[in-house]
Amino acid sequence: MKVLQVQNIRYGNLLNGLDFDWHQGEIIALMGANGSGKSTLARLIAGLIEPTAGEIRLTIDGTSCNWNTVTRWQEIGLVGQHPRRQTIGATVAEELGYGLLNLGHDIRWVQSRVRELASSVGLGGKEDQSPATLSGGERQRLVTAAILALQPSFLILDEALTMLDARAQAKVLELLFQAQTETGQLWITHDPELARLADRLLVIKNGKLVDMGKPQEGLINSEIESLYGIREFPKKTFSRAQEESQRVLEWKQTKYESRLTLNKVVRAGEFIGIVGPSGSGKTTLLDSAIGFILPTEGQLLVCGKHLSKDGLKTVRRKTRLVLQEAGEYLIGRSVYHEVFYGDQGRDLLAERQARLAFLEGFGISARLAEEAPERLSGGERQKVALAAALRTLPEVLLLDEPLLGLDTMSRASIQTMISAWDDLTILYVTHDLREVLQYADRLWLMENGNVVLDCSIQCWKEHQEQFRVSGVRC
């Protein structure tokens, strides 16, 4: 039996003496607010960064090993928040088989194992595809399967299950539970439902660890409520678009190669919730709305005008897209520079104070405003991306999983802000129907590049089983 012992670990001002034992075969859920140090702890354990004080020990049947001599990549696997950073293979098969070949396994056995792994995470038949062609959820499944195949003694999943639809998450959880006997697992998550499946719950707060014991008990503790600021989202109090409103987006018998087929209308001020399983075409639909891809058949009308290459600049002035994993695309030298790029020529004191107040509305403090984006947590970077998108008050806002990686308090504050933009037309992609139920006017369910269901929010429960079968959390 192997035990990983984290002893008095410190890292700058973020982690202030963390202690816990992690047993092989034990599943630990780790929760905490954005920026509390969860991902930093993951990188410390995986050996990607070194602590400023304290140590990590590996004991095998009670015998302590020198941590500096441990082959960490064989003992510890890490699935990060951003699967695009972790894929290196030219194809799905290469990604799944790369580590196994490096361990010296026979090539024929590896080929057979690759087919099994691909099938187990719903990627059967896609072995020859490039990981770049996969959806975010599919790529996350690929990375998880590739690391599980190496059979590490300990596995860290840093928000790795968040972007998966219900069916895909169930597949990955099945693999994780199958591996539990030989693999200790640390699930970093903001999802209480997922945390309840763990054996033990740890919470990071103010640089310290709080051991909450059994998650079924800990998650009803007032400590968690205090940490996350859990409260109900405000009820919708503003009016929505009427049937006679202007047609802002109109796909007329459009096809985008084999990826997407659309014949839909979106009216000014509408909030459309777009749901469906991973790889169903949700992100592709948003790409089409902003002109990243153009139809091979039919046409897209934007405010009544045919979208063509010549009109892309006009469309993109009116439309803002917040990408999935938007925090990965920040390039400003500071948070302030990222959000207000191009507006700083006349950065008067009064205007600067107003801008800092704007950032505060997204949970971005004046201190964070001067930080480089790459120094922020994943959730903090997501908030910066949202602030940058909303700064210019676009007419159409396209949101691709905007709440990924956010703790509950941050999610509530962002949703409150989004819901207040009643003049905006919003297309909101999510795996979790609950994110949009209080705000959406209509729901689109996507499967295989088609909108297979278009229903008003008032009658969504009539179709609840169809949503569930499709893998949508509701």
List each language-model region with its residue ranges.
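Helix-to-loop junction immediately C-terminal to a conserved catalytic motif
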Residues: A46, I290
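Conserved ABC ATPase "signature" region
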Residues: R108-K126, A350-R367
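Conserved ABC ATPase signature
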Residues: S130-L134, E138, A372-L376, E380
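Conserved H-loop
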Residues: E182-T189, L424-V429
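Conserved beta-strand-loop-alpha-helix hinge in the C-terminal portion
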Residues: K208-I230, N450-R473
